[in-house]
A protein has these predicted regions:
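Intrinsically disordered, low-complexity terminal regulatory regions
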Residues: 1-93, 97-175
Protein backbone atom coordinates (compact mmCIF):
# COMPACT_ATOMS: atom_id res chain seq x y z
CA UNK A 1 0.00 0.00 0.00
CA UNK A 2 1.35 3.41 -0.90
CA UNK A 3 0.95 6.12 1.70
CA UNK A 4 0.98 8.87 -0.87
CA UNK A 5 -2.03 10.69 -2.22
CA UNK A 6 -1.71 11.24 -5.95
CA UNK A 7 -3.18 14.47 -7.29
CA UNK A 8 -3.50 15.24 -11.00
CA UNK A 9 -4.93 18.63 -11.93
CA UNK A 10 -6.04 19.76 -15.37
CA UNK A 11 -7.34 23.28 -16.09
CA UNK A 12 -10.67 23.08 -17.83
CA UNK A 13 -12.79 25.56 -19.72
CA UNK A 14 -16.18 25.73 -18.01
CA UNK A 15 -17.80 24.91 -21.35
CA UNK A 16 -15.82 21.64 -21.41
CA UNK A 17 -16.86 20.64 -17.89
CA UNK A 18 -20.52 19.69 -17.39
CA UNK A 19 -23.92 21.20 -18.12
CA UNK A 20 -24.58 22.03 -14.46
CA UNK A 21 -21.33 24.00 -14.17
CA UNK A 22 -22.15 25.87 -17.38
CA UNK A 23 -25.62 26.79 -16.09
CA UNK A 24 -24.25 27.90 -12.70
CA UNK A 25 -21.63 30.06 -14.42
CA UNK A 26 -24.35 31.62 -16.56
CA UNK A 27 -26.37 32.31 -13.39
CA UNK A 28 -23.28 33.88 -11.74
CA UNK A 29 -22.58 36.01 -14.85
CA UNK A 30 -26.14 37.31 -14.91
CA UNK A 31 -25.73 38.45 -11.28
CA UNK A 32 -22.62 40.52 -12.10
CA UNK A 33 -24.77 43.35 -13.48
CA UNK A 34 -21.82 45.23 -14.96
CA UNK A 35 -19.46 44.50 -12.05
CA UNK A 36 -16.46 42.18 -12.14
CA UNK A 37 -18.29 39.74 -9.85
CA UNK A 38 -21.46 39.55 -7.78
CA UNK A 39 -21.56 39.59 -3.98
CA UNK A 40 -23.13 36.77 -2.00
CA UNK A 41 -26.25 38.88 -1.37
CA UNK A 42 -26.83 38.96 -5.15
CA UNK A 43 -27.44 35.21 -5.19
CA UNK A 44 -30.86 33.70 -4.47
CA UNK A 45 -30.72 30.24 -2.89
CA UNK A 46 -34.18 29.39 -4.22
CA UNK A 47 -32.95 30.02 -7.76
CA UNK A 48 -29.85 27.94 -6.97
CA UNK A 49 -31.66 24.89 -5.57
CA UNK A 50 -30.39 22.56 -8.32
CA UNK A 51 -26.80 23.14 -7.17
CA UNK A 52 -27.14 23.63 -3.40
CA UNK A 53 -26.00 20.21 -2.17
CA UNK A 54 -22.73 20.48 -4.07
CA UNK A 55 -21.95 24.14 -3.35
CA UNK A 56 -19.49 25.35 -0.75
CA UNK A 57 -18.58 28.87 0.36
CA UNK A 58 -15.07 29.88 1.38
CA UNK A 59 -14.26 33.25 2.96
CA UNK A 60 -11.03 34.88 1.78
CA UNK A 61 -9.06 35.70 4.93
CA UNK A 62 -6.25 37.69 3.33
CA UNK A 63 -3.45 35.66 4.93
CA UNK A 64 -3.44 32.96 2.26
CA UNK A 65 -6.00 30.81 4.04
CA UNK A 66 -9.72 30.40 3.51
CA UNK A 67 -12.50 29.73 6.00
CA UNK A 68 -15.09 27.15 5.03
CA UNK A 69 -18.26 29.09 5.77
CA UNK A 70 -20.61 26.48 4.32
CA UNK A 71 -20.23 23.03 2.79
CA UNK A 72 -23.14 21.67 0.78
CA UNK A 73 -25.17 18.80 2.22
CA UNK A 74 -24.08 16.35 -0.49
CA UNK A 75 -20.44 17.34 -0.03
CA UNK A 76 -20.76 16.78 3.74
CA UNK A 77 -21.36 13.09 3.07
CA UNK A 78 -17.83 12.78 1.65
CA UNK A 79 -15.49 12.26 4.63
CA UNK A 80 -12.51 14.43 3.66
CA UNK A 81 -10.25 14.44 6.75
CA UNK A 82 -10.33 17.71 8.69
CA UNK A 83 -12.81 19.34 6.32
CA UNK A 84 -15.93 19.70 8.43
CA UNK A 85 -19.23 20.99 7.14
CA UNK A 86 -18.34 24.55 8.09
CA UNK A 87 -16.19 26.57 10.44
CA UNK A 88 -12.82 25.14 9.46
CA UNK A 89 -9.70 26.63 7.92
CA UNK A 90 -8.99 25.02 4.57
CA UNK A 91 -5.31 24.74 5.56
CA UNK A 92 -6.33 22.24 8.27
CA UNK A 93 -7.80 19.82 5.73
CA UNK A 94 -5.80 16.59 5.39
CA UNK A 95 -3.72 15.57 3.62
CA UNK A 96 -1.82 18.83 3.43
CA UNK A 97 -1.15 18.45 -0.32
CA UNK A 98 -4.92 18.26 -0.90
CA UNK A 99 -5.51 21.41 1.20
CA UNK A 100 -2.77 23.28 -0.68
CA UNK A 101 -4.28 22.30 -4.04
CA UNK A 102 -7.67 23.67 -2.96
CA UNK A 103 -6.17 26.88 -1.56
CA UNK A 104 -4.28 27.51 -4.82
CA UNK A 105 -7.48 27.07 -6.85
CA UNK A 106 -9.54 29.35 -4.60
CA UNK A 107 -6.81 32.02 -4.44
CA UNK A 108 -6.45 31.95 -8.23
CA UNK A 109 -10.19 32.42 -8.67
CA UNK A 110 -10.29 35.32 -6.22
CA UNK A 111 -7.23 37.00 -7.81
CA UNK A 112 -8.54 36.63 -11.37
CA UNK A 113 -12.06 37.72 -10.35
CA UNK A 114 -13.47 35.22 -12.84
CA UNK A 115 -14.68 31.62 -12.87
CA UNK A 116 -12.07 28.88 -12.95
CA UNK A 117 -12.57 25.17 -13.42
CA UNK A 118 -10.33 22.15 -12.91
CA UNK A 119 -10.64 18.44 -13.50
CA UNK A 120 -8.99 16.76 -10.53
CA UNK A 121 -8.05 13.12 -10.21
CA UNK A 122 -7.05 11.67 -6.85
CA UNK A 123 -5.37 8.29 -6.42
CA UNK A 124 -4.49 6.23 -3.39
CA UNK A 125 -3.91 2.52 -2.81
CA UNK A 126 -5.16 1.50 -6.27
CA UNK A 127 -8.34 3.55 -6.05
CA UNK A 128 -8.95 6.70 -8.07
CA UNK A 129 -11.73 9.16 -8.48
CA UNK A 130 -12.13 12.19 -10.65
CA UNK A 131 -14.20 15.31 -10.21
CA UNK A 132 -14.69 18.73 -11.75
CA UNK A 133 -14.48 21.74 -9.45
CA UNK A 134 -15.88 25.07 -10.61
CA UNK A 135 -14.89 28.08 -8.49
CA UNK A 136 -16.73 31.40 -8.70
CA UNK A 137 -15.51 34.57 -6.95
CA UNK A 138 -17.87 36.69 -4.86
CA UNK A 139 -17.13 40.30 -3.93
CA UNK A 140 -17.30 41.74 -0.44
CA UNK A 141 -20.54 43.60 0.20
CA UNK A 142 -18.99 45.80 2.88
CA UNK A 143 -20.22 43.47 5.63
CA UNK A 144 -19.15 40.00 4.50
CA UNK A 145 -15.63 39.24 3.32
CA UNK A 146 -15.00 38.29 -0.29
CA UNK A 147 -15.71 34.63 -0.92
CA UNK A 148 -15.17 31.85 -3.39
CA UNK A 149 -18.13 29.60 -4.13
CA UNK A 150 -17.32 26.12 -5.41
CA UNK A 151 -19.43 23.55 -7.22
CA UNK A 152 -18.26 19.94 -7.33
CA UNK A 153 -19.43 17.39 -9.88
CA UNK A 154 -18.35 13.88 -8.90
CA UNK A 155 -19.48 10.32 -8.34
CA UNK A 156 -20.36 10.74 -4.65
CA UNK A 157 -20.34 7.00 -3.93
CA UNK A 158 -16.83 6.65 -5.36
CA UNK A 159 -15.64 9.77 -3.51
CA UNK A 160 -16.92 8.36 -0.20
CA UNK A 161 -15.20 5.02 -0.82
CA UNK A 162 -11.95 6.78 -1.70
CA UNK A 163 -11.79 8.94 1.44
CA UNK A 164 -12.97 6.09 3.68
CA UNK A 165 -10.12 3.92 2.40
CA UNK A 166 -7.70 6.78 2.94
CA UNK A 167 -8.83 7.20 6.55
CA UNK A 168 -8.80 3.44 7.19
CA UNK A 169 -5.13 3.42 6.19
CA UNK A 170 -4.52 5.73 9.15
CA UNK A 171 -3.12 8.51 7.01
CA UNK A 172 -5.76 11.15 7.63
CA UNK A 173 -3.74 12.98 10.25
CA UNK A 174 -0.22 12.11 9.16
CA UNK A 175 0.00 13.19 5.51
Amino acid sequence: MSGTLGIAIQPLRVADSNAEAVRLTEYWSARCEGRAMPARRDLDVVEMRDWLGRLSLYEVLGDGDMWCRLRGSTMCTIPVPGHDSDGVLVSRTQPHSFAEMGLRHYAETHALAEPTCYRIELSFDGLTYRYDRLALPLASDGVLRPMVMTFIKCDVRRARAFWERYQEAGLALTS
